[in-house]
Amino acid sequence: MTVPLYADAREAIACKTRFVPDFPVPGVIFEDLTPVLADAAAFSLIVDELAKNAMRLGADFIGGLDARGFLLGSAVAYKAGTGILAIRKKGKLPPPVHSEEYSLEYGTAALELPAEGLELEDKKVVLVDDVLATGGTLDAARKLIEACGATVSGYAVVLEVDGLGGRERLNDAPLVVINESATA
């Protein structure tokens, strides 16, 4: 078995990302990171890069967003030596919960964390997700973390889709992006 060698995480993303035209709607090119995450060498480089930045940002916890943020966030937290917060979509946790609603193109959604059993007061959280597009989900996660008494010390994503305003929306803390979208 040949193990691919990549110069860095950016090269791994560029080599392994799958582009799917007209998904989820005509005119959109979906950038599927599944092959990137499935490649052990690529995944390792990405986790190392995100963990290095999480430590630089002073993370006490990594906040992984449902669902791919769970995969990335867990590995990053392990590597950085922090705890992991699984920031869930509404309805996945038993009550009581902290909840933060946010707008979608066609409605609303919410993110939740348990209201009991977590000691987040005065802690620093780095939020981790796979893709930054409009920034709506990460912004809602920030508000949720703040409602729990913690501070978001930074955001870390694998891929940023340029031109959708996500970077501007998240201007309250440092943003780490490994690779910009190739289709922007």
UniProtKB/Swiss-Prot annotation:
Pathway: Purine metabolism; AMP biosynthesis via salvage pathway; AMP from adenine: step 1/1
Record EC number: 2.4.2.7
Entry keyword set: Cytoplasm, Glycosyltransferase, Purine salvage, Transferase
BP terms from Gene Ontology: adenine salvage; AMP salvage; purine ribonucleoside salvage
CDD domains: PRTases_typeI
An example molecular function term from Gene Ontology annotations: AMP binding
Subcellular localization: Cytoplasm
This protein's GO CC annotations: cytoplasm
Cleaved signal peptide residues: none
Pfam families attached to this UniProt entry: Pribosyltran
Catalytic activity: AMP + diphosphate = 5-phospho-alpha-D-ribose 1-diphosphate + adenine
InterPro entries linked: Ade_phspho_trans (IPR005764), PRibTrfase_dom (IPR000836), PRTase-like (IPR029057), UPRTase/APRTase (IPR050054)
Record function comment: Catalyzes a salvage reaction resulting in the formation of AMP, that is energically less costly than de novo synthesis.
Assembly description: Homodimer.
Family membership noted in the UniProt record: Belongs to the purine/pyrimidine phosphoribosyltransferase family.
Name listed for the protein in its UniProt record: Adenine phosphoribosyltransferase
Source species: Corynebacterium diphtheriae (strain ATCC 700971 / NCTC 13129 / Biotype gravis)
